[in-house]
Amino acid sequence: MSIKSKLLGAVAGTTLALGAQAALAGGHSEITVAYFLEWPMPFEYAKQMGTYDEELGVKVNWVSFESGVKMSAAMASGDVHLSVSQGVPPFVVAASAGQDLQILDVAVSYADNDNCVVRSDLEIDKDSTAELAGKKVAVPLGTAAHYGFLKQMSHFGVDVGSMEVVDMDPPDGAAAISQGAVDMFCGWGGSLRRAKEH
C-alpha cells in the first residue's frame, strides 16, 4: 500500500470518526452512515472489518445510495446521520434549501468519473452540437453530473431549455440510452461505462 493510500485512508477514517462522534453526541446508540458504491474509498476496508463499530462502541449501519441527492433526502428525514462521498453539488443544493448539514471534509475530485454521452447512432459530435436541441437527456438533477451537463451545454452554446431533461439516476439513465429511450445520458461510474457502449 502506498504512502498516499495510507494517508487517504487515515484522513477518511478520521473524518468519518469525527462525524460519527457528532452523531453520538446527539444521544444515538447506533448511527446510520450513507455511502456511495460507485466511488470505492479507503474507509471501506475499516467498514468491512467492523473497525468503526469497535472503536466507537456503537453499531454502525451502512446504507448505499445511488446519488448524493438521495443521501440528502435520507439525512433530512433523519434516516441517515452521516453521508460519505455525498458530492459537493448535492450538498450545496440541500444546504441552500435550508437543510442543516455540515461538511467535515472534501476528499476527491470527480473530473474523471462523470460525463455525458450522446447515442452513437445520432452521429452528433463537438462540431454538430446544435443538433442536441429537442433531444431527450437523462441526468440525475442536483448532482456533479448535472452541473457538468450544464457547463458542457453552455460551452457548446446549446440552450438547455430546448432539450427535454429527465431526472434519472445513472443506472436508469444507462438503461434508457441502451434502449433508445433517451438521446443523451449524463452520469458516472459503471453506468457511464455502460452508456458509452451505445
Regions found by a protein language model. Give the residues of each.
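Sec/Tat signal peptide C-region and signal peptidase I cleavage site
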Residues: 18-25
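Phosphate/pyrophosphate-binding betaalpha-module
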Residues: 193
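Conserved, function-defining micro-sites of small-solute handling proteins
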Residues: 175, 179, 185-186
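Bacterial N-terminal signal peptides that target proteins for export
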Residues: 1-11
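Short, glycine-/small- and polar/acidic-enriched structural segments
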Residues: 26-158, 164-169, 183-190
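Extracytoplasmic/periplasmic substrate-binding proteins
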Residues: 196-198
